[in-house]
Amino acid sequence: MLKEYRTVKEVVGPLMLVDQVESVSFDELVEIELHNGEKRRGRVLEINKDKALVQLFEGSAGINIKGAKVKFLGKPLELGVSEDMLGRVFDGLGNPKDGGPKIIADEKRDISGIPINPVARNYPDEFIQTGVSAIDGLNTLVRGQKLPVFSGSGLPHAELAAQIARQAKVLKSDSKFAVVFAAIGTTFEEAQYFIDDFTKTGAIDRAVLFINLANDPAIERIATPRMALTAAEYLAFEKGMHVLVIMTDITNYCEALREVSAARKEVPGRRGYPGYLYTDLSTIYERAGRILGKEGSITQIPILTMPEDDKTHPIPDLTGYITEGQIILSRELYKKGIMPPIDVLPSLSRLKDKGIGKEKTREDHADTMNQLFAAYAQGKQAKELSVILGESALSDTDKLYAKFADAFEEEYVSQGFTTNRTIEETLNLGWKLLTILPKSELKRIRDEYLEKYLNKAEESK
């Protein structure tokens, strides 16, 4: 029989202090019954002798200290998981949000998950085709990788997230592909955009959506990504699926952490965020990967908005340390109408060389990727020089590089949010753009590939 406590001592923001408790453990699930019979949930955040600090998921509004009854349920916050979750929409705490029935769970899992033994990890080396040339061709996503998108306020990261979720697939694999989508602190319009896009395109049949709205309690945001990852782990490691987890917006998650930290009166770290922000983010990002002997995998694309477009802000800064690269959206490209506005030069996928090449994408992928990077960088330099000195100061070769940079942005990077390019189409487009430059400038591509692919590209112009 569970004990019922009427010893609530204090409620501050999203936190409740309960006195005279016995046999309570960290992270234990708590049920709070209000004086009017309403029930809310929370979890134990800290224990000090006979006092327990409880974090409230549904907020503290309307709680009367004298009339509240508290029960400690003896288990952590869990999610009931089943393959029937595919095609469904849930709120940030795993309750159905689409008007459908509750899921009949195959099992219940602690949302904190179990760390993957480093020795049991399998190395990511299989190409995932997103259909977006700037990612597939230049910053390749590999199965089991964690590759964040660094965006800015007002940039179209929601459209890019929906496009990747809709188009992504593992080539040359018979295993099922699923998408787990977590919207953290999004507006109603943005959440509805995702639901409508998934439903309209049929992508929802292979997707699980967790939606935490901006007007939902901030504390729910701390649970939402863990709910999504718990569902992903079940589908990947129990059902053998390749699971792509897209989480937007991690910045809102970190703001919720800061709110709890401030309520606990902890010593703040950089910009007021808690000193354990790095450790906390790692408990989310490190749940990506592959396990030896298991067919499935979890690939993560966390999306975050950089406050004031600042890459040195603690959230993108710490995310960059934990993850394996970053895709950066550019406000300059966005103003030019380049969609998606992916800035390929500062973007990076640290595992891209493991997922490309013969029998994965195509033999010429690495060489063309290096050449496109180099040519675009030189083209941007030439354009900057022409602004300062005038176009007449450029050599004929520099003018060609400037022309290449414009064509690269308009044709290669810009493809809209509905075009789904195969890796063959992306590579062939790269070769077509390289024909703008003299053959003598293509020094990063082997002669055998120049003979095989360059002539074809010139003929197709």
Swiss-Prot record:
PROSITE patterns on file: ATPASE_ALPHA_BETA
Gene Ontology annotations of biological process type: proton motive force-driven plasma membrane ATP synthesis
Alphabetized Pfam families for the sequence: ATP-synt_ab, ATP-synt_ab_N, ATP-synt_VA_C
Keyword entries, A-Z: ATP synthesis, Hydrogen ion transport, Ion transport, Transport
Signal peptide: none
Alphabetized SUPFAM superfamilies for the sequence: C-terminal domain of alpha and beta subunits of F1 ATP synthase (SSF47917), P-loop containing nucleoside triphosphate hydrolases (SSF52540)
GO molecular function per UniProt: ATP binding; proton-transporting ATP synthase activity, rotational mechanism
Source domain of life: Bacteria
Protein's job: Produces ATP from ADP in the presence of a proton gradient across the membrane. The V-type beta chain is a regulatory subunit.
Stated family: Belongs to the ATPase alpha/beta chains family.
Name of this chain's protein: V-type ATP synthase beta chain
